[in-house]
């Protein structure tokens, strides 16, 4: 194997050193796992600037790794990275995070065998695969302890999200090539067929599959999405609900069981909220003085006409462009051009060259592609989609969390030109 350029390696090492200095100046002291758990459960998140600087460091480390590995080992290492997910899937399935003690003394392999019933040989290999990715640590032969990462598996939402990623997402990924062949590389107009449907049930999309076939995976998905929800800025941290007139109506389209609307209504009691979702989703949820539950399918024209706000939080990324045009068109027909606005509370992908983008954001994008035919969109892609819906519809403003203007998450405010 040819050695990498000395100048290239030294240049990257110097870049890495400067990036670490900038990150430490921004991030301050490193948080403990307990702080991270508190951050997730209290819905407080690090700043977007801190995230961006962290991912710059990761990207530089990857570039160094690609050079010192050489092209073929680097290529094969990436091709086999699903084996890391397989080991992590087994670890979460066996609940090793609860069996391995978090304390001064490690947990023996014999103890783990007794708790799981799995052979020494298989457990040793599962834990080796995890430990190589700094998830658990073998501190002595057949003696295992927690790392900061493995401790996070004790957080219910994170455990569920990892399980979903190592199960549904990984199996959907294995069907991606078959999906491309079947669809001739053209995305369907809705959620079926998809790589997920090819892996699990050719007649059902993810949400339909969960509700009619596999409620166990469905419950895990809900818990996992709760974990991701806590890492996003709150909509009220971005959009100024106090600016709406007394008695304004906010329609929470696809709002689930109304958690968002109830929370915002407590902070802004001058507003009235209508939460719309499918009957099975809102079943059993009681109305309150400020929040009304309403059965509605986003594929049908919206029955609430002339509302002040139609809010969609993390809805459109679950659907391909054609479906999003249909969903938004069903809202546009209900809007009053003199006062109605649509608020799209979604990720906004940066317009960057592929190699300069954040890997984690790309992984989120590929997750919705594989499971839902969905799409995370850049500003350019959002504008193209919005223009396709209706020539009068335009982005009037993007609301950001204070101090994070231009970050990867914002609320796009759409209005109809009069």
From Swiss-Prot:
Keywords: Cytoplasm, Methyltransferase, S-adenosyl-L-methionine, Transferase, Vacuole, Zymogen. S-adenosyl-L-methionine binds at residues 254-255, 277, 297-298, 313. Pathway: Mycotoxin biosynthesis; aflatoxin biosynthesis. GO terms for cellular component: cytosol; vacuole. InterPro entries: COMT-like, O_MeTrfase_dom, Plant_O-MeTrfase_dimerisation, SAM-dependent_MTases_sf, WH-like_DNA-bd_sf, WH_DNA-bd_sf. Residues 1-41 form a propeptide. It catalyses: sterigmatocystin + S-adenosyl-L-methionine = 8-O-methylsterigmatocystin + S-adenosyl-L-homocysteine + H(+); dihydrosterigmatocystin + S-adenosyl-L-methionine = 8-O-methyldihydrosterigmatocystin + S-adenosyl-L-homocysteine + H(+). Optimum temperature is 40-45 degrees Celsius. Sterigmatocystin 8-O-methyltransferase; part of the gene cluster that mediates the biosynthesis of aflatoxins, a group of polyketide-derived furanocoumarins, and part of the most toxic and carcinogenic compounds among the known mycotoxins. The four major aflatoxins produced by A.parasiticus are aflatoxin B1 (AFB1), aflatoxin B2 (AFB2), aflatoxin G1 (AFG1) and aflatoxin G2 (AFG2). This is Sterigmatocystin 8-O-methyltransferase. The gene is aflP.
């Amino acid at each position: 194997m040819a050695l990498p350029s000395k100048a290239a390696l030294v240049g990257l090492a110097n870049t890495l050193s400067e990036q670490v200095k900038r990150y430490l100046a921004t991030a301050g002291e490193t948080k403990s796992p307990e702080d991270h758990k508190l951050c997730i459960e209290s819905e407080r998140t690090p700043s977007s600037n801190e995230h961006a600087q962290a991912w710059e460091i990761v990207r530089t480390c990857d570039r160094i790794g690609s050079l010192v590995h050489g092209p073929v080992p680097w290529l094969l290492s990436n091709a086999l990275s699903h084996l890391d997910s397989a080991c992590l899937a087994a670890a979460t399935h066996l609940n090793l995070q609860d069996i391995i003690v978090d304390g001064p003394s490690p947990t023996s392999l014999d103890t783990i065998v007794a708790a799981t019933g799995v052979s020494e040989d298989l457990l040793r290999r599962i834990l080796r695969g995890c430990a190589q990715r700094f998830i658990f640590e073998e501190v002595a032969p057949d003696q295992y302890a927690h790392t900061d990462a493995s401790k996070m598996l004790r957080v219910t939402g994170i455990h569920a999200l990892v399980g979903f990623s190592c199960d549904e997402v990984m199996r959907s990924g294995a069907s991606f090539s078959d999906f491309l062949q079947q669809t001739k590389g053209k995305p369907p107009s809705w959620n079926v067929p998809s790589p997920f449907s090819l892996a699990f049930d050719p007649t059902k999309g993810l949400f339909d599959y969960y509700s009619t076939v596999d409620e166990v995976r469905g419950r895990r998905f809900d818990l996992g999405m709760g974990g991701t929800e806590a890492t996003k800025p709150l909509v009220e941290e971005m959009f100024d609900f106090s600016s709406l007139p007394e008695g304004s109506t906010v329609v929470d389209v696809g709002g689930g069981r109304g958690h968002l609307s109830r929370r915002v209504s407590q902070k802004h009691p001058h507003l009235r909220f209508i939460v719309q979702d499918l009957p099975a989703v809102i079943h059993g949820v009681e109305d309150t003085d400020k929040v009304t539950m309403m059965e509605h399918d986003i594929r049908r024209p919206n029955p609430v006409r002339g509302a002040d706000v139609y809010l969609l939080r993390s809805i459109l990324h679950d659907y391909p462009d054609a479906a999003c045009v249909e969903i938004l068109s069903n809202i546009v027909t209900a809007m009053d051009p003199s006062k109605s606005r649509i608020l799209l509370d979604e990720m906004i992908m940066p317009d960057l060259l592929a190699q300069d983008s954040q890997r984690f954001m790309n992984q989120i994008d590929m997750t919705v592609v594989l499971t839902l035919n969905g799409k995370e969109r850049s500003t350019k892609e959002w504008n193209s989609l919005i223009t396709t819906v209706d020539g009068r519809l335009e982005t009037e403003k993007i609301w950001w969390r204070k101090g994070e203007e231009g970050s990867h998450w914002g609320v796009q405010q759409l209005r109809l030109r009069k």
